Amino acid sequence: MKVSYKSNADKVSADFKRAAEKALTTSALLVEGDAKLRAPVDTGNLRSSLNHKVETDRATIGTNVEYAPFVEFSTSRTPAQPFLEPALRENKGKIQKIFAEHIRNATK
């Protein structure tokens, strides 16, 4: 009796990688959008500068506005007005669901 075996490990690995990248992108957009809603508005520059970047295994949400850290964390004269950290913290459950859904769909 002859038994043959064909591995699909490469396909499964590629499917999981694509699912993770899609989940990262979806999650980054979620947090970025929430941070934009939370960002204090004076000129609107801070809010409009928020963006995201997705790499293979991480997503970065941030801004290039020089004064953003002072808004998020405070100065000696100005109280903190956090917008990034709360956006991430408040969406952790949704992010977990996004990843679970994308991974589950990759296994179908």
Show where each model-derived region lies:
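Short, Lys/Arg-rich flexible segments
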Residues: 1-108
